[in-house]
A protein has these predicted regions:
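Extracellular and organelle-lumenal recognition/adhesion modules and their flexible linkers in secreted
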Residues: 1-132
Length: 132
């Protein structure tokens, strides 16, 4: 495992992967406020991708490249109202884009092992309640 290496992933802008239908999103002092009381549960609020086509997304990838077989500790720094209304999904893909495995994270941190067969991954922030 890599020791003392930290990569901070932040939500800095609205992208194609941000749920915007009826949403109010504001960015201030390094914090994001997302409000959408009518958003259905089970939909992604925002996604972070390791691989992106610049021509499609107009931005660089926001997740670091991970080493196969290595363990990583992920910490999610967020506040949600009501409590438990946000969770995260980590999805691993092989080289042809087929989903290998999925980790559902309902706490603030998790330790994962990057699969040996994985080529890419993404992280989705999901809505579990109607008020954030």
């Amino acid at each position: 495992m890599l020791k003392n290496k930290t990569f901070k992933v932040t939500w800095n802008y609205i992208s194609q992967t941000t749920f915007m239908y009826g949403s109010k999103v504001s960015f201030s002092n390094g914090e994001v406020t997302f409000i959408n009381p009518l958003m259905p549960s089970g939909l992604p609020i925002h996604e972070w991708l390791m691989l992106k086509q610049f021509s499609k997304y107009k931005s660089a990838p926001s997740l670091p490249i991970l080493r196969r077989g290595q363990h990583y500790k992920l910490h999610f720094d967020f506040d949600a109202t009501p409590a438990g209304s946000v969770y995260f999904i980590i999805i691993f893909y092989n080289k042809n884009g087929t989903k290998l495995s999925t980790e559902i994270v309902k706490s603030n941190s998790i330790t994962i092992q990057y699969p040996d067969e994985a080529y890419a991954y993404k992280i989705k922030m999901m809505n579990a309640a109607c008020l954030l």
